[in-house]
Amino acid sequence: MISQEPYPMRFHPLMKQTIWGGEKLSTLLGKPASGHGNDAESWEIVDHGDDQSVVTNGALAGSTLADLISQDPSWILGSSQTEGQFPLLLKFLDCNCVLSVQVHPDD
């Protein structure tokens, strides 16, 4: 169990580059830039395999979201526990060109 009282946590964003990305995530939102002009996604909160949000502030700094959920699922998820992982992926996109429809029926 996590003995720490809940507090507003900040997470380090994960930056993803693609051929359709741009520079707006860094210029408009101040996100770290790769310097290649193809920064497409800033994953703000994620618990998906090896892609993990890491707490950057407070007593739990350095812990991943998956670590916190495995230690004490109800501390993060409350009574809405869903298969042991955080149920949402929160991200910003910079689509520097028109994209095709993307469907993820199994997710």
For the regions a protein language model found, what residue spans apply to each?
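Transition-metal
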Residues: 1-107
